[in-house]
Each structure stands twice: as C-alpha cells, then as structure tokens.
Amino acid sequence: FAMAQAKKREACSLLCLPFTITKQVLNLALSIALLILSTLLGPFKQPAINFLENNRGLVILFFCLPASFIFDLAIKARIYVQRRFLDPDSTHSARVNEIRDRVKEWGKVPASDRKPLCTARPNWLSLSTTFFDKTKCHQIPIDLHEILRFDEKNLILHAEPNVTVREVVEYLVPRGYTLAVCLEVGDATLGGLAFGVGMTTYSHKVGLYQETISEYEVVTANGEVITVRADNSHSDLFYCLPWSHGTLGLLVSLKLQVVPAKKYVHLKYITANSQDEYCKMMMKYSGANDKEEKVADFLEGTIFSKDKAVIMLGSFAEKKEKPDVKVWSQVNDVCLWYKPWFYKHVESILNAGSNHEELVPLESYLLRHNRAIFWVLESMIPFGNHPVFRLFFGWLCPPKPAFLKFTTTPLIREWTFAKQVFQDIVLPLDTLKEQVDEATRLFDRWPLLVYPCRIYDHKRGPQGQLRAPPSSRVTPGTNFAMFNDLGVYGTPGQLEKKLPYNPTQAMRDMEKFTRDVGGYSFLYADLFMNEEEFEQMFDLTLYKKVRKQYHCNGAFPTLYEKIRPEVDVIAIGEQYAKKSN
C-alpha cells in the first residue's frame, strides 16, 4: 500500500508539472519586472509606484487579467488531471483512508515535536483576505474534489469539500435543482462555506448555509473517521463545526439540502426613496414581522445612498406559468460578458425612477454578482463597466481571487485593509437603519448589500458559536429571528475624497457596534478586535467543550489563532491614518 501511494504521489508530481512551471514562471516574471523597475527608474521609482497605484486598472487590464486567465487554466488542468487520469480506480473511501492514515502517522510523533494540524490547501486558494502561516503546522493534503451522489428522492447532495459552487450549479441546474443556499461567487468551495459561513438571497427562508447541512464526515485529531449529525452522539460537534474554520477536524465530505428549481427567476425590482421605506420593506418582504407573510423565493436589497435603494424579489418561474408576453420578452441573461455589471443594471433601474420586472436564467441569477465580485471590481478597474471594455475584455473578468492572493505583495496586503474595506456582518434586521447610518459614518462607501437571513434558536442551550436570538427579536410563533448580512466592499469614500481616514478606528468602531447589537463578523475578513472582544462577540462555551472532547487542544489551532490577521492590522492602520491626515 505504501509503495502504491508513493507511486501515486510521484505520478501526481509529474502530471501537475505544468501547473508548477506556470506558478514559477509567474513568480519569476513578477520578480524580474520589479527588479528592472527598481534598477532603471532610480530616482523616479517612487513616482512610478505612485503612477501604478493610481492607475492600477491599467495594470490589472494588461497584466492581471491575462495572467489570471492562464493561471486559472493551469489550476483547472491540474484538477482535471487529478480527477481523470491519475487514479481512475480511486474511491472516496480510499481517499479518506489516506487522510486518516496521515493523521494517525502524525499522532505517532512525540507530543513535544508535533505541530498543529491544518490542510495543505494553499492560502491563495481560499477566499479569505488573511494569510494563515501554515509553515507552523503539519499540513495534510485534502485532494477531495468530487460530487459523490445526488439523492433526488430526499433532495440531498453528497459531495467532497473542494467542490466549487460553480461546479455544483453546473451539475444541479440542468437537472432542475439548486442548493438551498448557493453563494454568488463561483470559486467558493462547499467545504470552505461549511466550516466558515454562507448566506444568500434564499436565506430569509432557510437561514445560513450551515442550516442546510444534514451531515458532515470528519477526520478527528486522533485519526477517527466519524459521521456528524444533529441527531447522533456527535450533536455538540455538529453545531460547532460551522464558523470553526478547520479548528475541530478535517472535513472529508458533507451532505447538503437541495431545492427544486425552475429554468428562470422572475425578478421584480422595487425602488425605494427613503430610508424608512426600504427598512420597512425589508422587514415586510422577509417575513420578519409575520410568519404568515407570503415571501418570495429570493430577497435582496442594494442600498445606493442613505435614502435610495432597490429591493429585489425573485421567484422561480417557467414560461407556461407566466403567460405575460411583456415579461417574457424581457429575458435578461445578466452574466453575459458584454452586459453591464449586475449592480450597475440595478442602479440604472433606480435612476429610471420606476419599478421593473424581467426574467433571468437561473444559473445567471445564482452567479449574478460573480463578474464584478459584487462591486469590488470597480475599485480595481474603474473603467471596467464601460461598454467597450465589456465587449472586448469582459470575458476575462473577474480576475481570479486565487491569482490576486497568489500575487499579493506585503504592500498590497496592507492596502486590503488600510485603503479598502471588505466586510460582511450578520446583524439584526430591525437595526437596519442604524447599520446604514454607522456604515455611512465609518466608511462612506456605496452601494451596501443587504440579505435578510433567519437565525434559529435550536432550543438546546449553547448551540455553537452563534447564540440563540433573544426572544424579543423572534418572529412570533416561530423559532427564528430575522437578521441580515450587511456587505461593505471597496475603497472608503473618505480616501476617494482625499479626506482623513483611520482604518483602525473605523473597523474597531464597526466591530463594537456589531457586538453591541448582538451581531457577528464574517471571519474571512480582517478582524481588529482582541481575543477578549472576540469572545464577547461569539459564544465559545460549547466550542471549548468540543475541543476538549475531541482532543483538539494541541492538535489544531484555536479559532482566534486561525482567523486573526497575520500582520499587525492595528499598527499598520494607524500608520496609514497619519499619512491621510
């Protein structure tokens, strides 16, 4: 067996050689370019750097987009080779057993010499903004990329953790189904969402991504392979795995809830012209006030200014069910490369001053924000929504998050939190007005994303890192309260207006507001709170019990260790604040 595994790894190295070469060539090209610039420019070095910083759209257009395209092809080729040619007889059980055996081998090392466990998945393949230092850990390869089974009768998809959202969409939609919670970013993985968090426009009906997971298959710190469900002996672990970020075990498969779907989504765009109006609309259309409210399948709000917003209601639709010729003449595939970015399309409806209806193909609806990475791409390529750019270069968008992380330098890493903001925050929906006011004061960045979402009280005492919602916020006659994701992305308005901006103060104020109203920060983004403040925001009571029960202490980093920024964001933020004054 050992010899077979050695041959397998050797074959893998040979077959993945093109990917390795591509990676090295890109690194070398970047290093040479920087060296040439540094040598030739001499006294003009700093002005040149300033020019590149102020015109980064050109850099992305002529370097990042083509290189990202090649890079993505190399990654896809590597995965394709692994799936199709490396070991055609490989089974899920065999792959899991190999991971289990690696963990058991690690367990034989004297405790004093052991490093904590983590996956060997490179940092640049994750969608987080941070770079956890994996060199301090014992890395376990998790080469699990397969959809294992679709149980059409019980509407359950069984898949391995590295399957991406795009792959699932392409698999399920032609069959007439979709995930109950399907993230809009195609490169997100099912496992990353399971051990992190996911929320979409269907979440006002079913809750967070974790609520749609019926079963986890996990390799524990002592090398056991266990099935984790809410109704078996591992129920405590079941409720702690979400938001754990790989600090309680290694995920090797999961089972997800699937819902029947139709070919189209019938979208209604409703404009709002005051803050009170859109706040009341979100409460009503989400069913937060009344459990009998007939809610749409999809609900989303895009807030373009303090008093202007568009609320989108979406319902599954087929042509035969909607004979309205006017509506069916407006089928809009919003993901075509030459079309306006989705949020710009929404903004045009707001500017027109009237409500609008149209049909969007289901797959395009599910990935509608992928091309512009919501609206982050505008900060990278200010001219990216220009019709000429879309026509000739739109098919290259977006630059792959993996490539952007892969080419991140220390300076660019600082910019991700000092000159930009990437935050998703779970907050009680009845505080939406206060959320918008605070985000405006701190970041002055538009638009803002709002997805309503149920947070459940599972009636079991401690229920993982998220507390049960207070009874005062629970929708009468139910076991859930309506929260929402507030998404803030892009360059703070203060910096665009050349005004003083302190990223440290802004982020710490936002985190304090979140704690005060009983909310939670998504942990993919940089945190500025200390460990004590972190434990005020999240309930780690059950988490700590589970870590002890499953021998995680010493075997995996703690949650705070895993997700805290690898750089001193507070000190760096203060330095940038002084520069902006």
Residue ranges and their predicted role:
Residues 55-62, 66-78, 404-410, 471, ...:
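Activity-critical C-terminal alpha-helical subdomain
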Residues 82-97, 264-267, 415-423, 487-496:
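Glycine- and acidic
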Residues 118-121, 297-304, 420, 425, ...:
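A short glycine-rich, hydrophobically flanked beta-strand micro-motif that places a catalytic Asp/Glu
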Residues 1-112, 558-581:
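Eukaryotic N-terminal low-complexity, Ser/Thr- and Lys/Arg-rich leader segments
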Residues 86-187, 191-202, 450:
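Glycine-rich N-terminal segment of FAD-binding domains in flavoprotein oxidoreductases
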Residues 4, 8-30, 42, 49-53, ...:
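C-terminal substrate-binding/cap subdomain adjacent to the FAD-binding core in PCMH-type
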Residues 425-446, 484-485, 489-522:
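Extended C-terminal subregions enriched in glycine
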Residues 132, 310-317, 392-395, 400, ...:
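Short glycine/threonine-rich loop-to-helix capping motif typified by GTGT followed
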